[in-house]
UniProtKB/Swiss-Prot annotation:
Signal peptide: none annotated. 1-deoxy-D-xylulose 5-phosphate binds at residues 156, 183-184, 205-206. GO terms for molecular function: thiazole synthase activity. Keywords: Cytoplasm, Schiff base, Thiamine biosynthesis, Transferase. This is Thiazole synthase. Pfam families: ThiG. It comes from Coxiella burnetii (strain Dugway 5J108-111).
């Protein structure tokens, strides 16, 4: 059991709702993974009438909605989108995304901090999508963000943890903040590695939605997240350069001599 934004949760896996072959398959994947938080784009919800079925399906799921500002590239766009999302979804949660480069989909750190500062003052619980840059994360925390969502690699790349050192440093430097890896994971083993490092949760979309079987993949990621977290809580042994016998030699009729 853990808490985020004043909400008690069991699952440490969050799922995005885009790119699935069908809305029903998305719903099945969410249920298979036992997910309790799903992200949704406000811009999709403001699209034509044909999307009403998708919205109705989202509302039928026993999940908390985390609207995002996907597609925004400026403070003004992001803040206005966040305000609209609060009215539409009746939540003060907002996943803040402000893209600075269309090729890498890397967030714009300067606009991100400015927008986060405004939204925190307006009472939002801001979930900023950011890089693993320590100084950027510190500025976001200084702005009032209690949650940080650094990427492991560029969105949709599936490359896994590209800068393990920087991510581990974030965990060490921000022990009281909730850290959720957002973007770049492609395999359940990536998620397990993140959780073993002490991160609080993982947000996925492409790795599940674009899998050959999204439902099975969602379930696999859920187990990996749980296993990784248990490994962290259990206290893993440190790696050694030499072997260490697990069977005691007390009472043995012989001794092992060094070569």
């Amino acid at each position: 059991m853990w808490a985020i934004g004043g909400v008690q949760l069991n699952s440490r896996l969050l799922l995005g709702t885009a790119q699935y072959p069908s809305p029903q398959l998305m719903s099945d994947a969410v249920k298979a993974a036992g997910v309790e938080i799903i992200t949704v784009s406000l811009r999709r919800q403001l699209s034509p009438q044909k999307e009403n079925y998708f919205w109705d399906l989202l509302r039928s799921l026993p999940c908390h909605l985390l609207p995002n500002t996907a597609g925004c590239s400026s403070v003004k766009e992001a803040v206005n989108t966040a305000r609209a999302a609060r009215e539409l979804f009746n939540t003060h949660w907002i996943k803040l995304e402000i893209i600075g480069d269309e090729y890498t989909l890397q967030p714009n750190p300067f606009e991100l901090v400015n927008a986060a500062t405004i939204l925190v003052k307006e009472g939002f619980e801001v979930f900023p999508y950011c890089t693993e840059d320590l100084i950027l994360c510190q500025r976001l925390v200084d702005a009032g963000c209690r949650v940080l969502m650094p990427w492991a690699a560029p969105i949709g790349s599936g490359r896994g943890l590209m800068n393990t050192y920087a991510l581990q440093l974030l965990r060490e430097r921000f022990p009281k903040n909730i850290l959720i890896i957002d973007a770049g994971l492609g395999r359940p083993s990536h998620a397990a590695q993140v959780m073993e490092m002490g991160f609080d949760a993982v947000l996925l979309n492409s790795a599940v939605a674009l899998a050959m079987d999204p439902v099975v993949m969602a379930a696999g990621f859920a187990k990996a997240v749980e296993g990784g977290r248990l490994g962290y809580e259990g206290g893993m042994i440190k790696a050694r350069n030499v072997a260490k016998a697990t069977t005691p030699l007390i009472g043995k009729p012989f001794l092992i001599e060094k070569p």
